[in-house]
């Protein structure tokens, strides 16, 4: 009946087509509800018939009279329509709906007719009463969305004798969260049909909009192909891991208390925005009390590889290192150091792992390459993720999902090769290598580091060119980094042993420069 109709004054369809034939109160005239409904339906059918005829004229006539504002094609003048936001979302005029003052925008009959069916692919997004639809160049994906969240949703409402409205039963939060949740839900329901689509590389864009009379809103959310490929690969690798990642990062359960729901919704919004942007998410998924990795390590490892572009060799190194930390006798102390360390202390902590024999100098260089100044924070997050997941598996009696990637030795680049050459000369030529290394480790200022290198030159262990390479003028960042590479070589190959409390770190002045770079 009219009370449960999709269109009409104050009905759901008015959000898309305000004041259209079905939503204009003046068209709902009559003595009975049926007469009102018949009058509005007649107005709509007449408009639809007119647009269908003009759409046919676009295809049948060869005249190129005007350019359609929507599709950009040249169409016959007789097949054009004047449209404002009452029948074409987000179109604006001088005033809302008064023809005498607002001529609107010229569009062809094909576009006018096509937009009539937009509600069949439109859904509710977030909690701000905004709408959205998914645009994809893959017909199979677009058709699946329209069928599941359009036709089938409306059929269920009609069968249940409920008022028609757009689909919005998302157990998530935020607009980006709704978009990613949709892709997860589709993949979970139609894995065989959609895996190939997700990995096809065709772009998908979600358009979030509102068409309110007081002002329109539109936002394009571009879904990265890498994110879709990651979801498809994760679902193939493990359905359980896919579900853990989906529910652990995107789901907001309905049984949460109000304060819990608010906190969870904020987390989901932040995570989904980062996923859409292809940013680091593992750090946000770590909880320390109790230690836990939301989403599971298998999903995060694949996300790091597919979306973040982290090399599988690097992930294998970090996984092995994280397990070494978690399984050590000093695990609690080492984890606390990782959690509480300032950014400038992370290089020193990783050098400590080289001294323990858990990392080689090549691996240290591979994890912290030159010109990757912000990677240390993500390295710390990944290590903690491995530690927390390993501890969780031990408590639950489960097997840790280790990487199957075989260890591969990469050939050193010019910088690492130069460090190795200098390190060998120091190892062979310095009379007291351990003392010299201790001085280099404890140096807190650039001048002191240069002084330690000059001592090596004085003893003939290295030459002037080596000194210039290790301590470049006006580039203190490079000097600190090269110092760490050299120490890693000496700890690894030179087997220099220092007391456990001797940790290299940046000096106070240099810290400020590096952190604000």
Region locations from a protein language model:
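Long, acidic/serine-threonine-rich intrinsically disordered regions with weak helical/coil propensity
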Residues: 1-4
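Basic, glycine-/proline-tolerant helical and adjacent loop/strand elements
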Residues: 6-167
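Intrinsically disordered, low-complexity regulatory regions
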Residues: 154-507, 511
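Short, intrinsically disordered, charge-balanced linker/junction segments flanking boundaries
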Residues: 514-515
């Amino acid at each position: 009946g009219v009370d449960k109709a999709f269109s009409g004054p104050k009905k759901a369809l008015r959000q898309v087509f305000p004041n259209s034939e079905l939503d204009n109160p003046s068209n709902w005239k009559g003595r009975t509800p049926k007469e009102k409904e018949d009058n509005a339906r007649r107005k709509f059918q007449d408009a639809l018939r007119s647009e269908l005829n003009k759409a046919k004229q676009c295809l049948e006539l060869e005249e190129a009279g005007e350019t359609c504002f929507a599709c950009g094609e040249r169409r016959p003048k007789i097949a054009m329509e004047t449209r404002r936001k009452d029948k074409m979302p987000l179109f604006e005029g001088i005033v809302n709906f008064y023809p005498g003052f607002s001529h609107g925008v010229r569009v062809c009959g094909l576009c006018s007719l096509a937009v009539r069916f937009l509600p069949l692919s439109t859904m509710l997004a977030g909690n701000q009463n905004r709408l959205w639809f998914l645009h994809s160049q893959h017909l199979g994906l677009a058709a699946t969305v329209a069928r599941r969240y359009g036709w089938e949703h409306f059929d269920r409402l009609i069968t249940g004798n409920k008022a028609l409205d757009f689909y919005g039963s998302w157990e998530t939060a935020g607009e980006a969260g709704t978009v990613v949740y949709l892709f997860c839900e589709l993949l979970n329901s139609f894995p065989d049909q959609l895996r190939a689509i997700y990995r096809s590389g065709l772009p998908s864009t979600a358009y979030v909009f509102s068409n309110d009379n007081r002002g329109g809103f539109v936002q394009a959310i571009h879904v990265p192909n890498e994110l879709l490929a990651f979801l498809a690969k994760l679902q193939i690798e493990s359905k359980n891991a896919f579900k853990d990642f989906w529910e652990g990062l995107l789901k907001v359960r309905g049984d949460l208390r109000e304060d819990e729901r608010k906190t969870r919704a904020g987390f989901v919004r932040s995570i989904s925005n980062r996923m859409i942007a292809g940013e680091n998410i593992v750090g946000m998924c770590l909880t320390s009390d109790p230690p836990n990795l939301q989403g599971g390590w298998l999903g995060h490892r694949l996300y790091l590889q597919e979306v973040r572009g982290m090399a599988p060799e690097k992930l294998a190194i970090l996984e092995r290192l994280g397990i070494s930390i978690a399984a050590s006798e000093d695990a609690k102390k080492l984890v606390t150091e990782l959690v509480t360390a300032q950014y400038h202390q992370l290089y020193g902590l990783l050098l400590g792992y080289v001294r323990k024999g858990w990392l080689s100098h090549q691996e240290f260089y591979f994890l912290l390459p030159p010109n990757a100044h912000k990677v240390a924070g993500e390295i710390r997050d990944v290590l903690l993720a491995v530690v927390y997941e390993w501890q969780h598996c031990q408590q639950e009696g489960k097997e840790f999902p280790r990487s199957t990637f075989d260890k591969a030795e990469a050939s050193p680049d010019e910088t690492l090769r130069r460090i190795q050459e200098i390190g060998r000369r120091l190892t062979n030529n310095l009379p007291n290598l351990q003392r010299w290394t201790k001085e280099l480790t404890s140096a807190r200022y650039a001048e002191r580091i240069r002084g330690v290198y000059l001592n090596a030159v004085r003893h003939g262990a290295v030459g002037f060119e080596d000194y210039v390479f290790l301590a470049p003028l006006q580039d203190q960042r490079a000097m600190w980094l090269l110092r760490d590479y050299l120490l890693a070589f000496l700890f690894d190959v030179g087997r220099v042993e220092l007391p456990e409390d001797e940790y290299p770190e940046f000096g106070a002045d240099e810290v400020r420069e590096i952190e604000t770079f």
